[in-house]
Structure formats: structure tokens, C-alpha cells
Regions:
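Core catalytic alpha/beta fold that binds nucleotide/phospho-ligands
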Residues: 2-120
Length: 120
């Protein structure tokens, strides 16, 4: 049982959606390109309230970083959706080292991301 727990990590992050409302994509493209890959930006911009989507994806990325023991950057983490469920893709060799369970919730003021990472 202890071995199983040692292979697990958990990360959680909450963010105010207003941080992304104040930094509109059209005026702050470089800021967004330092955090999100192109597919994530395109996904978020499809929604009327893209700030909630950006905040949710940011919270997920922060939660991933907190859930694993290795150094990783924002652009090494891609959040994708399979149906309505968020999934994680890692851009480097870490992808084969972890499985993730992800949950995200966002509403008018806050977004929260929770990640459980299993080291394989």
C-alpha cells in the first residue's frame, strides 16, 4: 500500500478569472504564448467568455506542476479534451512516466484545477 502512495502526487490550483479578463488576448498575445500552446489558445478563443477557459487551463497546468516531482514548464504541458473530460499531454520524455486524472471547474470569478499524477 505504501508503494502505491509513493507513486502518487496531487496538485491543486485556484485562480481568479479576472486575471485573464484584464489581459485580453488581442492586446497580450506574447503573455499567452508563454503559457499556452497554439491548440489551447484556439480552443479558448472559441468561447464567448474565453477568460474562464484560459483560467481553467492555467489552473490545470499549475496543478500538474505541483503534482509531479520533476521540473516542467507551462509549454511542456498541453490540456486537451476527450469528450467533456480534460486530459494532459506532456511535450517531453515525461509523458511516458506519468498517468493523470484531471478535474477543472470554472465559474464567473474563479477557476480551479485538480490533478492526480501516477508515476508509472
Amino acid at each position: 500500500m505504501l508503494e502505491m502512495i509513493e507513486n502518487l502526487g496531487i496538485g491543486i490550483d485556484i485562480i481568479e478569472v479576472s486575471r485573464f479578463r484584464r489581459k485580453k488576448y488581442e492586446e497580450n498575445r506574447n503573455f499567452y504564448k508563454k503559457i499556452f500552446v497554439k491548440s489551447e489558445i484556439n480552443y479558448c478563443l472559441k468561447f464567448k467568455n474565453s477568460a474562464e477557459r484560459f483560467a481553467g487551463k492555467f489552473a490545470i497546468k499549475e496543478a500538474v506542476i505541483k503534482s509531479i516531482s520533476e521540473k516542467i514548464g507551462f509549454l511542456d504541458i498541453e490540456t486537451v479534451y476527450v469528450g467533456r473530460k480534460p486530459r494532459i499531454r506532456l511535450k517531453n520524455s515525461l509523458e511516458k512516466k506519468y498517468n493523470f486524472i484531471v478535474s477543472v471547474s470554472h465559474e464567473k470569478e474563479f477557476a480551479i484545477g485538480i490533478v492526480i499524477a501516477e508515476k508509472i
